[in-house]
Amino acid sequence: METLESELTCPICLELFEDPLLLPCAHSLCFNCAHRILVSHCATNEPVESINAFQCPTCRHVITLSQRGLDGLKRNVTLQNIIDRFQKASVSGPNSPSETRRERAFDANTMSSAEKVLCQFCDQDPAQDAVKTCVTCEVSYCDECLKATHPNKKPFTGHRLIEPIPDSHIRGLMCLEHEDEKVNMYCVTDDQLICALCKLVGRHRDHQVAALSERYDKLKQNLESNLTNLIKRNTELETLLAKLIQTCQHVEVNASRQEAKLTEECDLLIEIIQERRQIIGTKIKEGKVMRLRKLAQQIANCKQCIERSASLISQAEHSLKENDHARFLQTAKNITERVSMATASSQVLIPEINLNDTFDTFALDFSREKKLLECLDYLTAPNPPTIREELCTASYDTITVHWTSDDEFSVVSYELQYTIFTGQANVVSLCNSADSWMIVPNIKQNHYTVHGLQSGTKYIFMVKAINQAGSRSSEPGKLKTNSQPFKLDPKSAHRKLKVSHDNLTVERDESSSKKSHTPERFTSQGSYGVAGNVFIDSGRHYWEVVISGSTWYAIGLAYKSAPKHEWIGKNSASWALCRCNNNWVVRHNSKEIPIEPAPHPRRVGILLDYDNGSIAFYDALNSIHLYTFDVALAQPVCPTFTVWNKCLTIITGLPIPDHLDCTEQLP
């Protein structure tokens, strides 16, 4: 029914056709709409009859009128009959297909309108409240006026009655350019409401237009989407607001707690200062009393000595005035002895007197404490430590990490974190993932030795400085363990080979003494081999072989199950780099591949990556790659060497050279 209704709708007024005219182009148009088109083409004071042509609003075909004007066009009786039957068959209601778009808009407005509507037909003053609004008449009626104006007979039975709504809602929005025309379409180009005449003869003639319902649906959907986003954003803001309020509360509580703590700590400092003041004051008083007591005793002794000396001085002076020799000699000896004794006794008192002990050396110096008090402030997290890679040391299974801190005074402890480094790309993810790190907590020194590490492996280390206020971490530092150290196993050496006392050098020795047979010993004629004393089953390892003038030798690796009576590389259990005079080959399972090193290596480096299945040979002095075996190792492997002339010396336990380390470097 909706599709049929759209076919019965006038393209100008967007209502069901009323008195439709059949145009020569086979389209239809309401008589009144056609008349409005002619009026819009008229100049001022020009009669409508002077217009003899107009364009079909549907196909733009030019319709030429006869002298009769619009009356000369045929009425589309068939279409009018279809419309009449359509209206009769339609069921009245808010979802009825007979409803016009205007009526649906009226219903929508009715639902939202709470204004008091008065009867527009009443002669009474004031008018009665309206009980119905006739959409067809565009008038609101009270019950009495409704019965008088809308008897239950045609054509009034076809009028649409709805709940009362204001007059402005009935009439709808009017066109700004054509005041008597209602807006019934939307100009997409200018983004504004227009009427049919605006599209036919106005400035919107060539603009893109759309039906109100289409634009309504689009804008409503857009508004709903924006509203949903706004509601979502408001919800997020409300959540944020709640967090901010909660944070403010926490700030208030924590600030109050810190203020109380500050008062408590300052009171404690004041208490300590007052206590120390009392203790030091007591010491001063005791020192003063002791010194004054001692000085008072010395003063009394001096006065007593002076009094005794004064009497003796008087007698001596009187004796000196005696001119009679006999009388003088009679008393002089006694007086002289007494003067000598008095002089000696006064001399004894002098060492006991210390005139410099006046408390001026009792100094009070609180400058250090004043500086500390002046520096009182919030405790902050310590500065990040710095890993000193140049001081760090490593073995094949340990690394000793050294670091420094310019803020050691505020550091309570350190925490060492480390993990295997697989490339620069994983540094950020590793730093953000606590599960990836091994952690050593509560370190008090500026160094720590980590044990049980994989040999020949690169690690990332970070050091965290910690105190009560928080912690800060150092920049990542890259350190690596050395390769697994090993020596030559004399029990495996061929009878015609001699192993040095330090088990690091092997040489051909025809005069070598007979050796007892062991399961590990190489036995074949010409297979003058010796094995290392270690079997490797994981990790990355690097060692070097010094070629001491030998021109016939083989260097490689072998499983424990490799036959001892065959040359290394002649079976599936061993891999070797061989030199036979000036011929160089790599050999595995009796398959030989020639290589041409230039210059001839004087030191060969071997890099074993057990986990990734590779055995690589290098010219160690010139950093030149010679060859790499790619193999899935299924058993532990042992370094193996064959010498036909001169000697070979091994250097083991080395770190993997940086130019051979394929992992990406830290910045």
Swiss-Prot record:
<dbReference type="InterPro" id="IPR013320">
    <property type="entry name" value="ConA-like_dom_sf"/>
</dbReference>
<keyword id="KW-0677">Repeat</keyword>
<dbReference type="InterPro" id="IPR027370">
    <property type="entry name" value="Znf-RING_euk"/>
</dbReference>
<dbReference type="InterPro" id="IPR050617">
    <property type="entry name" value="E3_ligase_FN3/SPRY"/>
</dbReference>
<dbReference type="InterPro" id="IPR017907">
    <property type="entry name" value="Znf_RING_CS"/>
</dbReference>
<dbReference type="GO" id="GO:0016740">
    <property type="term" value="F:transferase activity"/>
</dbReference>
<feature type="modified residue" description="Phosphoserine">
    <location>
        <position position="96"/>
    </location>
</feature>
<dbReference type="GO" id="GO:0005737">
    <property type="term" value="C:cytoplasm"/>
</dbReference>
<keyword id="KW-0863">Zinc-finger</keyword>
<dbReference type="InterPro" id="IPR000315">
    <property type="entry name" value="Znf_B-box"/>
</dbReference>
<dbReference type="GO" id="GO:0070507">
    <property type="term" value="P:regulation of microtubule cytoskeleton organization"/>
</dbReference>
<dbReference type="GO" id="GO:0005874">
    <property type="term" value="C:microtubule"/>
</dbReference>
<feature type="region of interest" description="Disordered">
    <location>
        <begin position="471"/>
        <end position="524"/>
    </location>
</feature>
<keyword id="KW-0175">Coiled coil</keyword>
<dbReference type="Pfam" id="PF18568">
    <property type="entry name" value="COS"/>
</dbReference>
<feature type="binding site">
    <location>
        <position position="159"/>
    </location>
    <ligand>
        <name>Zn(2+) 2</name>
    </ligand>
</feature>
<dbReference type="InterPro" id="IPR017903">
    <property type="entry name" value="COS_domain"/>
</dbReference>
<keyword id="KW-0963">Cytoplasm</keyword>
<dbReference type="InterPro" id="IPR047095">
    <property type="entry name" value="MID1_Bbox1_Zfn"/>
</dbReference>
<feature type="binding site">
    <location>
        <position position="119"/>
    </location>
    <ligand>
        <name>Zn(2+) 1</name>
    </ligand>
</feature>
<dbReference type="Pfam" id="PF22586">
    <property type="entry name" value="ANCHR-like_BBOX"/>
</dbReference>
<dbReference type="InterPro" id="IPR040859">
    <property type="entry name" value="Midline-1_COS"/>
</dbReference>
<feature type="domain" description="B30.2/SPRY">
    <location>
        <begin position="482"/>
        <end position="659"/>
    </location>
</feature>
<feature type="binding site">
    <location>
        <position position="145"/>
    </location>
    <ligand>
        <name>Zn(2+) 1</name>
    </ligand>
</feature>
<feature type="domain" description="COS">
    <location>
        <begin position="320"/>
        <end position="379"/>
    </location>
</feature>
<comment type="similarity">
    <text>Belongs to the TRIM/RBCC family.</text>
</comment>
<feature type="zinc finger region" description="RING-type">
    <location>
        <begin position="10"/>
        <end position="60"/>
    </location>
</feature>
<keyword id="KW-0479">Metal-binding</keyword>
<dbReference type="InterPro" id="IPR003649">
    <property type="entry name" value="Bbox_C"/>
</dbReference>
<dbReference type="GO" id="GO:0035372">
    <property type="term" value="P:protein localization to microtubule"/>
</dbReference>
<dbReference type="GO" id="GO:0032874">
    <property type="term" value="P:positive regulation of stress-activated MAPK cascade"/>
</dbReference>
<dbReference type="GO" id="GO:0005829">
    <property type="term" value="C:cytosol"/>
</dbReference>
<dbReference type="InterPro" id="IPR003877">
    <property type="entry name" value="SPRY_dom"/>
</dbReference>
<dbReference type="InterPro" id="IPR003879">
    <property type="entry name" value="Butyrophylin_SPRY"/>
</dbReference>
<feature type="binding site">
    <location>
        <position position="198"/>
    </location>
    <ligand>
        <name>Zn(2+) 3</name>
    </ligand>
</feature>
<dbReference type="Pfam" id="PF00622">
    <property type="entry name" value="SPRY"/>
</dbReference>
<feature type="zinc finger region" description="B box-type 1">
    <location>
        <begin position="116"/>
        <end position="165"/>
    </location>
</feature>
<dbReference type="GO" id="GO:0031625">
    <property type="term" value="F:ubiquitin protein ligase binding"/>
</dbReference>
<dbReference type="GO" id="GO:0015630">
    <property type="term" value="C:microtubule cytoskeleton"/>
</dbReference>
<dbReference type="Pfam" id="PF00643">
    <property type="entry name" value="zf-B_box"/>
</dbReference>
<feature type="binding site">
    <location>
        <position position="134"/>
    </location>
    <ligand>
        <name>Zn(2+) 2</name>
    </ligand>
</feature>
<feature type="compositionally biased region" description="Polar residues">
    <location>
        <begin position="471"/>
        <end position="485"/>
    </location>
</feature>
